[in-house]
A protein has these predicted regions:
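N-terminal [4Fe-4S]-dependent radical SAM core
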Residues: 9-36, 46, 250-321
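Helix-enriched interaction subdomains in cytosolic or periplasmic regions
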Residues: 1-15, 112
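Conserved SAM/AdoMet-binding glycine-rich loop
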Residues: 34, 41, 57, 71-72, ...
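Conserved, mostly hydrophobic/aromatic
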Residues: 183, 293, 328, 332, ...
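N-terminal pre-triad scaffold of radical SAM enzymes
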Residues: 42-48, 62, 309-336, 369, ...
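Iron-sulfur (Fe-S) cluster-binding segments and ferredoxin-like electron-carrier domains
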Residues: 335-352
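Glycine-rich beta-alpha loop elements in corrinoid/cobalamin-binding modules
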Residues: 46, 54, 73-272, 278-284
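Terminal amphipathic helices with adjacent charged low-complexity linkers/tails
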Residues: 78-79, 207-260, 273-275, 281-285, ...
Length: 465
């Protein structure tokens, strides 16, 4: 496939071949000369080779570790399961993700009406994934390959790692580990954990070794609980939560509190005769590691298998946007970010951001306008505690509410300087802020930021978070 960027005279977009994407079929695997795969990833989304889509990020990170990786996007679960068989058994493990959204949120409105479209599918068509994707895919893989490890991750698995209220069935459900039969769960952003798992498995599958890694959850027998670190919290059992709403509420508060700590405890939740163990997360990803993740050789395009099948709406929305940071310390009660990305912000370097913008200017169809320079909240770039020792003692869900933390550095000047550097790049006419802005972060010293955004970076209406 060859594409040319016509918006800048003399500037050409990269020419890509099918081999520039991770393989999705046996034909593509054989074209690389591979006779065996190390890891096979299954995703509920279409395969878009872009750093905004989890399967692509994990696949590229594993590829960077020297592993042979393939992705099976949106396999058919209703026929003879040929999509689950076509690539055979991987040498190390299967990885399963529901996609960028929980499959039930993707499928149904708040009134539990079936949606007629799917933003993560070619043509925006619905019906290419089942309800409870992670559980369905994992059960199928365990049925076909009972001896091959299945590792689950992504937003659906992450937010269902312990007992949770399932709005769609109006009931409490146990950990997705119990319902799916998966061997291991990675919660949160997996770009630190997954490569560590791959390294740990180079010498063969050793579940005991994997259970020692941070940011994983697994099912354990009673005798294994006695060997856990002393800094652990025993939650109420799933069975007690079914009988007592107060017990479930207490569990939720404990889990939420630990997710807001810089140094969290191990969580243990009894379910039946086993225990769900949730190890503490890794420290916030470093700038170097975050830059490395964004610098992987993404094509930034949907896989050629979707040519002629219509646009993928989710991709169309973000294809000319740039993510500046990860994490959010807003602490909104309705938001899942603290449970998935955490409240501590990790920012990319200026050069990493500018390098990505340069790549954008060479993409087909780019007309000089960046749709978003943002993140979970638009204006938290390079923000955090001035004194990290104080942050280590803190368990506040929000650094903003009910008032700004006195330890918070809310200086917007680094972000303003980044905006200006982006706008000075050749090929960029204008950059917009499409993410929501937290106006409660403004102080007397940040009025210049609001002026900068309103005058130079608003495409119609200012978006707030």
């Amino acid at each position: 496939m060859t594409v040319h960027d016509t918006h800048t005279p003399g500037r050409k977009a990269p020419a890509y071949k099918p081999a520039d994407w991770l393989p999705t079929s046996l034909k593509e695997v054989r074209a690389r000369g591979w006779d065996e795969l190390d890891v096979i990833l299954f995703s509920g989304d279409a395969y878009i080779d872009h750093p905004s889509f989890g399967a692509a990020v994990i696949g590229r990170l594993l590829e960077a570790e020297g592993l042979r990786v393939a992705i099976v996007p949106q396999p058919n679960w209703k026929d003879d399961l040929r999509d689950f068989r076509k690539l055979g058994r991987p040498r190390l493990f299967f990885g399963v993700s529901g996609g960028a959204m929980d499959s039930m949120v993707n499928h149904y409105t708040a009134n539990k009406r079936l949606r007629s479209d799917d933003a993560y599918t070619a043509g925006g068509k619905a019906g290419f994934r089942p309800d409870y994707v992670v559980t369905v895919y994992t059960r199928i893989l365990k049925q076909l390959y009972p001896d091959t490890p299945v590792i689950i991750g992504g937003i659906e698995a992450s937010l269902r790692r312990t007992t949770h209220y399932d709005y769609w069935s109006d009931s409490l459900k146990p950990s997705v580990l119990v319902e799916s039969g998966a061997d291991l769960l990675i919660y949160g952003m997996g770009d630190k954990t997954m490569p560590e798992i791959a390294r740990a498995m180079r010498g063969g599958y050793n579940l005991n070794l994997l259970r020692k890694l941070p940011q994983v959850a697994y099912l354990a027998a009673r005798k294994q609980i006695e060997t856990l670190p002393e800094n652990r919290i025993m939650l109420h059992s799933f069975e007690r939560c079914l009988k007592d709403k107060k017990a479930f509420g207490e569990n939720f508060v404990r889990i939420e509190t630990e997710s807001n700590r810089m140094q969290a405890a191990t969580l243990v939740e009894p379910v039946g005769d086993r225990f769900v163990v949730v190890n503490p997360p890794y420290p916030s990803i470093s700038e170097t590691d975050l830059d490395r993740s964004f610098a992987l050789p993404y094509t930034r395009l949907p896989h050629p298998r979707y040519n002629g099948k219509g646009d993928i709406p989710a991709y169309e929305m973000i294809k000319f946007s740039v993510n500046l940071h990860r994490g959010c310390f807003g602490g909104c009660s309705f938001c899942t970010i603290s449970a998935h990305q955490g409240k501590f912000v990790s920012s990319r370097s200026e050069e990493s951001v500018l390098d990505e913008v340069r790549k954008l200017t060479r993409m087909p169809g780019f007309k000089g306008y960046i749709s978003d320079l943002g993140g979970p909240s638009a204006n938290m770039y390079r923000m955090g505690g001035r004194n990290e020792a104080l942050c280590r003692k803190c368990s506040r869900p929000s650094c903003i509410y009910p008032s700004l933390c006195r330890n918070l550095n809310n200086d917007h000047r680094p972000l303003m300087e980044l905006y200006r550097k982006v706008d000075r790049l050749a090929g960029v006419k204008k950059s917009f802020i499409g993410s929501g802005i937290r106006y409660d972060l403004f102080g007397d010293n940040n009025r210049d930021y609001l002026r900068e955004v309103v005058v130079n970076h608003v495409s119609g209406r200012l978006k707030v978070a």
